[in-house]
Amino acid sequence: MHILMYRWKAYNYRDIEQTFLLLGHTVDNIEQELGSYDVSPEFERVIEEKIRGTHYDMVFTVNYFPLISNVCERTGVKYISWTCDNPLISMYHESVFHACNYIFTFDKTNYLEFRGMGVKHIWYLPLAVDTERMDALLGAPEEAGRWKAAQDPEMRKY
């Protein structure tokens, strides 16, 4: 698959992009500061030109962006978002009903709420982590105790 990934200041893009690449997908990134998640004619133009200029199988974002959903709906490209924040105010937008959307949320109550409102393309998906990267950061298993504050009797009193 050829994936266009909109990157902003979310912490988990590196792990997600690495996983896409390991699965054999191609990833192009686009970054731009947004003043509004709902309306940004300049950014909509930029992303629409990018989509129309290159074949993408999907657009992916961490968290949901109504303006990206609107562009994907217009261009007929699938929009996949995976939320890592709650409440995610940007989801309370009429665009969540677009057929292009595939919304994944880590919060089961959020999933149930939007499913109850009639959003068809929403699923519950817990957050994930690149365990190999975390293992490398934490060191050998015998050193893992260094990172567990709860094991320290002094820390338990807090």
Where are these regions (language model features)?
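Catalytic core of nucleotide-activated saccharide and alditol-phosphate transferases
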Residues: 80-158
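Extreme N-terminal starter segment of soluble prokaryotic enzymes
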Residues: 1-3
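Extended catalytic core of nucleotide-activated donor transferases of GT-like folds
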Residues: 9-19, 23, 28-114
